[in-house]
Amino acid sequence: MSLFNNARWVAISQVVKIFVQLINIVYLARLIPPSEYGIMAMALVIINFGMLIRDLGTAAAIIQRKDIDSKIINSIFWLNLYMGLGIAICIVLFSPLISYFFREPKLIMVLLCISIIFPLSSSSSAHLALLERDSKFKKIASIEITSSVIGVFIALFLAYKSFGVYSLVWQTIIFNALSTIQFWKASKWRPAFNKMFDFSGLKEIFGFSAHLSIFNLINYFSRNADSFIIGRYMASSVLGAYSLAYRIMLFPIASLTFVATRALFPILSKNQDDHDALKKTYLDCVFAILFIVVPLMSGLAFLSKPFVILVFGKEWLLTSSILLWLAPTAIIQSVLSTSGTVFMAKGRTDILMKLGILGMLLYMSAFILGVQYSIITFAKFYFFANIINFFPAMYLLMRIINGNLFELFKKVLPIFCMGLIMIVVMFIVRKPINSLFDEFTFSFLLTMTFIGATTYFILAIVLLKPVRAFILNKVPFIG
């Protein structure tokens, strides 16, 4: 299956998940009180960390390896299952201590219930990896959509019946249970019970998986350090403003890069020895991501003040100033976040781990320096740290696929030129539009957005041959 087909089905699944998230926000928030949501948020701190270490990078190893036998898959299955059981037992044993730390007695029962998702999801991680390895993303999308929709309907029903936080707990359990059953049904592979572990096979993937697990842990802590430092040294209102800006920045970027990297990984892994195919596929992927991200984030930065005030209210004004720096940061991160896929496909998770350590040192230094001044300076330093981190990461990435930074910059330069022209046009028309509509009205915001989007679209048709060919050929999204 091609990258386009992979991305198409991953995107459909992701859109449904986002829709389910919106239902959670809009409808469940009306039925479940904030205090109950808070309990689930506490539980998710533990659950998300558990999910991070659940498979120790072994599922990625199944996808990455050019040739893999059933013995290694079987060993990975049993290792994951025991890891899932181990994490669940740890959560059960430590739930009173976790509850005491958060000063929330109800958290004990929530953690006891939700811990079941670890053995459930672990028992199907090998099956999911095999489906992804074979690019069966249409089947995966069908499974994830079905599980998401059924899960949210059950949550709505339970919330209506005043189950409170347990509506969210059961939504999570139902999603994992249904996904597990369907992944088992979709994959023909079955575990063997006579010899659970082939230690020679596990030894083969140990280096790949260990480095990937360490990178994931480093990345998890470095990405959450900013909120911890701001919360420790600045006012809670400042942390709130920063968190909102960060979520606004991250929401579209996370969705785009998740779709791209999940669809890209099996394709790159199969072509890991064909450097020309690898380079072309990766550069095309980066081009597609930046084609959307550059105008989106540039426009958001330019219109941050009216956008924030109109959508969130005047009390969030500080968020608009932070967005001026986090929006361009998102452009850099949208490229950096794809780099892990290439290093994984090439089996060089050792380089990925070292880059993770470098990134953590840069980000932590930026956070520690920035917090001494103001939240705006904090955001500026974060932006500069991303720029510094970009060059060694992309230099090493292009090097292992027999390319160079010049090829990367040459590929994406037209997009940045188009984005710059779009901002210049928006700057020129801003005053005339402001004379027609007040800056803090939806009429002004929508008009400016339309002008920016139209400018960018026209430039894309004129300057970019692939976009022109795509439109002229009228390639459907779903074929």
Residue ranges of model-derived segments:
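Membrane-interface junctions at transmembrane-helix termini in multi-pass inner-membrane proteins
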Residues: 3-4, 61-70, 120-144, 166, ...
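Membrane-proximal transmembrane or re-entrant/amphipathic helices at the cytosolic face
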Residues: 398-405, 426-479
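Signature of the first transmembrane helix
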Residues: 2-58, 82-95, 112, 117, ...
